Amino acid sequence: LVRSRGLGDVYKRQKYNSGLIRHVLIRTNHLLDEVMVVLVLTKRSLEHKDEIVAKIIQRYPVVKSIIINVNNKIGNTILGDECITIYGREYIVDECCGLKFRIGPQSFYQVNHKQTEVLYNKVVEIGHFKQEDFVIDAYCGIGTIGLIVASHVKQVLSVEIVEEAICNAKQNAKNNQINNIHFVCNKAEEQIVKWAKENKKIDAIIVDPPRKGCDSKLLDTIDAVSYTHLTLPTKA
């Protein structure tokens, strides 16, 4: 369709920083009844945009969202910082462990739904949480783990560096009518130290880091905080 509209050199040649389209990202919920299409472009505008949108939704009615993501930087990072919604909503909705979650174009969300539910239920099982517990959810993303744990504890303190994810997390808490969770946009290692200095009660820390793993500063922070704030069984 893009080629037939005469858009010319559409493919992004990373080496020469040329072209228009870098990636096409497809996100879907586990029922496959809501789909998001993210067009990662090197600029904000797309020729024949309305026709392209009409063709997509005509052929695929389950598409609820079409978004342009702008990434004109040299490198292999897939998504840029700016998102422009050109059709439908800014998100799709999925259900996990009985809760509903909004998923945006830049939101981290596990792709294997069945195993994700197994994993999150295992977190609850091995956490041995009590109703009086205060739990930190580091790298919380859109709030999935923290919101699932929230019904088992007194309060969840969640921290995430991505602002869009925090906005989605707050909306997810509201939509699921969960009030005992607090979200902060900050570096996890800095926020945990801040909470510790505020003498926040901490009974457990849940960490779900990005692919590169935990920041070494975070591990040092958890190690330091654990000796003054966590019980021995929780540290183990």
List the model feature ranges, each with a label.
Residues 1-7, 11, 229-236:
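Single conserved hydrophobic/aromatic residue that forms the stacking wall/gate
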Residues 5-15, 20, 43-67:
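Internal alpha/beta scaffold segment
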Residues 33-41, 100-104:
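Short, aliphatic-rich beta-strand segments
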Residues 41-44, 111:
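A general boundary/transition motif marking the beginning of the first structured unit of a protein
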Residues 48-50, 54-58, 62-230:
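Rossmann-like S-adenosyl-L-methionine
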